[in-house]
UniProtKB/Swiss-Prot annotation:
<dbReference type="InterPro" id="IPR002629">
    <property type="entry name" value="Met_Synth_C/arc"/>
</dbReference>
<protein>
    <recommendedName>
        <fullName>Uncharacterized protein YxjH</fullName>
    </recommendedName>
</protein>
<dbReference type="GO" id="GO:0009086">
    <property type="term" value="P:methionine biosynthetic process"/>
</dbReference>
<dbReference type="GO" id="GO:0008270">
    <property type="term" value="F:zinc ion binding"/>
</dbReference>
<dbReference type="Pfam" id="PF01717">
    <property type="entry name" value="Meth_synt_2"/>
</dbReference>
<feature type="region of interest" description="Disordered">
    <location>
        <begin position="1"/>
        <end position="25"/>
    </location>
</feature>
<dbReference type="GO" id="GO:0003871">
    <property type="term" value="F:5-methyltetrahydropteroyltriglutamate-homocysteine S-methyltransferase activity"/>
</dbReference>
<comment type="similarity">
    <text>To B.subtilis YxjG.</text>
</comment>
<dbReference type="InterPro" id="IPR038071">
    <property type="entry name" value="UROD/MetE-like_sf"/>
</dbReference>
<feature type="compositionally biased region" description="Basic and acidic residues">
    <location>
        <begin position="11"/>
        <end position="24"/>
    </location>
</feature>
Amino acid sequence: MAQQTNVAGQKTEKQRKAPFRADHVGSLLRSVPVKEARQKKAAGEMTAEQLRDIENQEITRIVEKQKEIGLDVVTDGEFRRSWWHYDFLEGLDGVEPFIPAEGIQFHNTKTKARSIKVTGKLDFTSHPALGDYQFLHEIAGNATPKLTIPSPNMLFFGEKADKGIYDDQEEYFHDMAQAYKKAIKAFYDAGCRYLQLDDTSWSLFFEDKGREVVRALGGDPETLPAIFAKTINDAVADRPDDLTITMHICRGNFRSTWAASGGYDAVAETILDGLNLDGLFLEYDDDRSGNFDPLRFVKRKDLQIVLGLITSKYGELENPEDVKRRINEAARFVSLDQLCLSPQCGFASTEEGNLLTEEQQWAKLRHVIDIANDVWR
């Protein structure tokens, strides 16, 4: 890596591999053509092939837009998904869609009702996301295509269809890890070199309300974090050296609202010194996220911390000097060379999207790039 001097006069390295100094979590506001096409498909007025053609056109457009504004990383915006997690999880062997009595509770609102049910042995034999990634790979050009998928830990929240299906929790987590190990290999063979696991499960340990949810699901909030970490580490254990795997740790993101609050403190050591990943995307866009003290648990020099200091929930641009000041605060705990910048979450974790315009979305991403260029120049 070539050395450069940043605005504070410190020597930093130009980031040539993922995660990048200016990165983003992945999901983007669904375009009007995609929304209209999905509605027509649901109404029986459009075939699956016609819908895919429109998705392909719009994904190509947003990939070009990401490159045009200066990003080194591109995603498909999750344009083929309704949810950031359910669509992918339903494609695993042994998992089926399920409509519960009500949606997920967020701050002052609820999502539409949707969940998953585990009906048999978990496995990964084939998956529609493979074709989705291959399309992104083909159109990425000289940018790095990033695939975003839910963490295996999200399967913990799936209902069991019948008694007798995974009564043994150890077997359940073992099979989660093995299914994901196969998935990682399949995506690698398809050309993927930058994979992101999205995970809201950790936020349950940030506050008492979440820990009660864990207990209601039959888990122990004292021991479950270590089990979650082992599952992740087992899943990624055999990854090739040239595959970058990061994790985005999220507190919920639905129509500009949130589901959880609290800092990382209760599980900071497990997350920051216990996960064998290449990078962590951490939300830090408001007071609900806590302070930077947990970053003291970052012991590895090869772990990149992507600071989510730019909110994806609203269109107003942050004061760049305030963002730079916060990056410098984080650098008290972690070397500036190990830090990157991104929005705190995606712009549309579900197809409804957050409450900002597409132009505001692109302005936010340009803002990330401009600030990163100033800090790590």
